[in-house]
């Protein structure tokens, strides 16, 4: 493969990477903790919304609410990571991508 072909391949990969990054920014995943907490985030792991069921809000038990929120965020983050790995996997040739 000559240098010109390598350069062209690199440009194509960069263009595809940018397209996938935009796709991830627009994609959403939901993480849940039971039916009480739902966290929505995009493929870049940016939280877009948190929904809390009123029945889980107990002023005398804030710790449970906090634990549920953490669990829902962790679930959503894991799903966002899986989505990114799925979309970016073909470009990485099966390598684990740092930060995803």
Swiss-Prot record:
<dbReference type="GO" id="GO:0043590">
    <property type="term" value="C:bacterial nucleoid"/>
</dbReference>
<comment type="function">
    <text>Binds to DNA and alters its conformation. May be involved in regulation of gene expression, nucleoid organization and DNA protection.</text>
</comment>
<keyword id="KW-0963">Cytoplasm</keyword>
<dbReference type="GO" id="GO:0003677">
    <property type="term" value="F:DNA binding"/>
</dbReference>
<comment type="similarity">
    <text>Belongs to the YbaB/EbfC family.</text>
</comment>
<dbReference type="InterPro" id="IPR004401">
    <property type="entry name" value="YbaB/EbfC"/>
</dbReference>
<dbReference type="Pfam" id="PF02575">
    <property type="entry name" value="YbaB_DNA_bd"/>
</dbReference>
<protein>
    <recommendedName>
        <fullName>Nucleoid-associated protein Rcas_2292</fullName>
    </recommendedName>
</protein>
<comment type="subunit">
    <text>Homodimer.</text>
</comment>
<keyword id="KW-0238">DNA-binding</keyword>
<dbReference type="GO" id="GO:0005829">
    <property type="term" value="C:cytosol"/>
</dbReference>
<dbReference type="InterPro" id="IPR036894">
    <property type="entry name" value="YbaB-like_sf"/>
</dbReference>
